[in-house]
């Protein structure tokens, strides 16, 4: 899905009109939904419902006040989900990981990158902008940050186990 609102200027500029977010699922999925934040240039939230988990992919605003409102909206999406959740993406937490504190407390979620290892820029990481957050019904078995430069952000690779199984 395109991450910018349909009437937005960025959606029509050549560089930005080709940018998007995607989720790939090996075993298929039960449902996909596209949510849009009310504010910010980057508004798309992809929701993918798997057999036992709901996954949300996000790219939050560069502006802190807008980001905080987006996190409140995301908090509601997590609360409305019937299954344990994983929320992942570029949170643009320019003020640091503490920006997620309210979101994590309100949702009861944990973050996979507990050491706050920098993820941006990929060629010389010095900022923690990207996160994977997960419900307590999931157990994080492995977390890695491969040192690759396919993007300006390092990928976060997680292996989860469903504790309710």
Give residue ranges: language-model regions.
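Structured beta-strand-rich core segments of catalytic domains in phosphoester-bond hydrolases
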Residues: 1-51, 144-147
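Active-site-proximal beta-strand/loop segments in catalytic clefts of secreted hydrolases
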Residues: 8-10, 26, 58-61, 89-91, ...
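Short, catalytically relevant binding-site loops at active-site mouths
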Residues: 11-13, 38-40, 61-64, 92-94
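Metal-dependent phosphoester-hydrolase catalytic domains
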Residues: 31-36, 79-86, 92-165
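Active-site-proximal beta-strand elements of phosphoester/diester hydrolases
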Residues: 47-61
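A short secondary-structure junction signal
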Residues: 56-60, 66-70, 98-99
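A long, amphipathic alpha-helix that forms part
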Residues: 66-83
């Amino acid at each position: 899905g395109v991450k910018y609102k349909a009437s937005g200027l960025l959606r029509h500029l050549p560089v930005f009109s080709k940018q998007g977010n995607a989720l790939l699922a090996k075993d298929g999925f039960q449902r996909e939904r596209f949510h849009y934040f009310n504010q910010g240039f980057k508004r798309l939230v992809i929701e993918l419902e798997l057999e036992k988990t709901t996954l949300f992919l996000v790219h939050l605003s560069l502006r802190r006040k807008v980001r905080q409102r987006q996190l409140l909206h995301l908090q509601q999406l997590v609360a409305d989900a019937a299954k344990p959740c994983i929320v992942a993406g570029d949170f643009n937490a320019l003020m640091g990981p503490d920006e997620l504190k309210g979101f994590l407390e309100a949702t009861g979620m944990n973050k996979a990158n507990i050491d706050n290892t920098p993820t941006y820029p990929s060629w010389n990481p010095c900022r923690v902008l990207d996160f994977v957050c997960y419900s307590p019904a999931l157990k994080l078995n492995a977390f890695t940050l491969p040192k690759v430069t396919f993007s300006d952000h390092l990928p976060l690779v997680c292996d989860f186990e469903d504790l309710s199984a």
